[in-house]
Amino acid sequence: MQAADPTADATAKFLAGLPVNGTPLENYSSATGWKTHAADLDRAWKQFDERQLAKIREWAPQALGPAYQDNGPMYYMFSGPDFLYANAFFPNASTYILCGTEPVGPIPDITKMSQHVLPSALANLRKSLDSVLSWSFFITKNMKVDLRQQQLSGTLPLLYVFLARAGCTIDSVELVALDKTGAFVPAGKGTTPGVKIVFTGPAARPQTLYYFTTDLADWAINVNPNFGKFCEQQGQGVTLLKAASYLMHSDNFSKVRGYLLAHSKVILQDDSGIPYRFFTNDKWDLRFYGKYLGPINRFLKNKQPDLEKDRAASSSPPLPFSFGYQWQPSRSSLMIATPK
């Protein structure tokens, strides 16, 4: 087993507002700015855990069955840095594959930051966590601004926070890149930048988290097939799709849609993922939870009359947590699709 990287792990705990006693960052945690950060995050996290994560942890083993125990790869396209929900639904995955258009950013180093800017950098970090803790998803437009701050920029600080708060210990962090064949090349050499984080979770075995900066539109994949080639080498996995902007409802995203339909042992999604019409009865077993109310106002053009009709004809078990764009549990719904 790989030894923990004390610097990366301490940085993750520091950014997550968790104790760093006995680490090189202990002195930094005596600053008022960090104490405020830790108290604010503790409070927000407690509410978030009670409202969302604790309920998912209770619901997922029974609802997902064998997929919950699956220790293969886990695909979460259009995820941004949302390791939180990936890990809550599928805690046993060997490899988490996340992606988004947001940059990875540099590896955070608290010791190189001026003590004058640290309080504002931590406040900005809390601000970028606001939407996922309040509404269960990142707002892409806001993230572009939040993640551009000069200190603690990119998705890595958020991934650190989520890993630390999920009770994981970071073993190693490496900036990577992919070439046209989907193979790893040194960071800066390939056209698809990413990060590879090896961590040990509560299950006490090494797991790997990848996050890649990439565009999943068909035209972008034609120009830059790197990420798709990498995924093909991972094989069959479990898939999560949540607050995916209904992008795969457009034929401009047919390649990623086709990949997930062909390579998923299970797909857990809200209605913003793959359109209902692709899950035909002869090929898929479908189970529904919650109440389907259609898209929120911003995405009304993506209504699915076939889904609405079929959902109205049968009742579904309630969903104890919110999921996707409908941020109240009583208005949320999800679908679990398993290939026959």
State what each model feature region is:
Residues 1-129, 207-340:
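Non-globular targeting/processing and membrane-anchoring segments
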Residues 130-153, 157, 161-258, 262:
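Mature extracytoplasmic/lumenal regions of exported proteins
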